[in-house]
Amino acid sequence: MNFEASRAKAIEKLNNFIEKNLSEYSKLRNFDFGPDNRTNISCLSPYVTHGIISEKEIIQKSLSKFSFSKNEKFIQEVLWRTYWKGWLELRPNVWSDYLIELNKIKEEFKNNQNYLCAVEGKTNIECFNTWVNELKENNYLHNHTRMWFASIWIFTLELPWQLGAEFFMQHLYDGDAASNTLGWRWVAGVQTQGKHYLASEWNIKKFTNNRFQNIKLNENAPPKVSEKSYQIVKQDFNNS
């Protein structure tokens, strides 16, 4: 995949997606056809992350072509980024605690074989290894694949979610502190207590068009547990 850092390219991608592919988005968005075929998704997130194009602009442009009812799923996905940013801004201790935990865990796992094999794409899970290499080479992963990846990392490879979140931020062109951190927390089961995401063999096969076989995962793992809860921190913008 090629991401050219220019506003002209961002607008071109947006227009092409709306004209050619948006009408089928809700039906095809969960499929990962591989890095050479991203026609079913917009691939605009790197441009949003770096401020080249805004969520508002994307939504307004899409609504100029299709009605809200035909656009609803796409708009929902765009607004998740905005929601996560607002959620984290109101609870900044989630981010500061994550950084503290990450520093401790990195030292503990620096020689851990499961971790070293995971980041090198040398596990016994073919699809996971493929995604590690794809992430490093393309600096992008399909959103559904990010969920599978995180679930395998946490529940099958039994690695801390904090290390996985860092690994994504090291490589993703669209790495966003809020979406990434809270997304990993959600998969683990600590963002919404007791609700986690477990990747399954049948789901991966279905939504990758059977590109991968013999996917042996822990599909019965319980959610991770966190004793911490975070209250909204009142924002004070009075500079007087």
Predicted regions and their residues:
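Short, solvent-exposed turn/loop segments enriched in Gly/Ser/Thr/Pro and often Arg
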Residues: 147
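C-terminal catalytic domain of photolyase/cryptochrome flavoproteins
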Residues: 1-143, 151-240
